Amino acid sequence: MADTTGRIPLWIVGTVTGILVIGLIGVFFYGSYSGLGSSL
């Protein structure tokens, strides 16, 4: 964990990307079920 000089660890990139993708899909489905999907 100490050799992260100037480079983001791959597991952090994967975790953040996964959270963003899951959050985006969740917001999309929530908006479509709430009737707000057309405004997104």
Swiss-Prot record:
The keyword Chloroplast belongs to this UniProt entry's keyword annotation: yes
Keywords, sorted A to Z: Chloroplast, Membrane, Photosynthesis, Photosystem II, Plastid, Reaction center, Thylakoid, Transmembrane, Transmembrane helix
Main location: plastid
InterPro entries: PSII_PsbJ, PSII_PsbJ_sf
Disulfide cross-links: none
Membrane topology classification: Single-pass membrane protein
GO BP annotation list: photosynthesis
UniProt-annotated location(s): Plastid, Chloroplast thylakoid membrane
Membrane-spanning segments: 8-28
Single GO cellular component term: photosystem II reaction center
Biological function: One of the components of the core complex of photosystem II (PSII). PSII is a light-driven water:plastoquinone oxidoreductase that uses light energy to abstract electrons from H(2)O, generating O(2) and a proton gradient subsequently used for ATP formation. It consists of a core antenna complex that captures photons, and an electron transfer chain that converts photonic excitation into a charge separation.
HAMAP family (alphabetical): PSII_PsbJ (MF_01305)
Family statement drawn from the similarity comment of this UniProt entry: Belongs to the PsbJ family.
Subunit structure: PSII is composed of 1 copy each of membrane proteins PsbA, PsbB, PsbC, PsbD, PsbE, PsbF, PsbH, PsbI, PsbJ, PsbK, PsbL, PsbM, PsbT, PsbX, PsbY, PsbZ, Psb30/Ycf12, at least 3 peripheral proteins of the oxygen-evolving complex and a large number of cofactors. It forms dimeric complexes.
Name by which UniProt lists this protein: Photosystem II reaction center protein J
Organism: Coffea arabica (Arabian coffee)
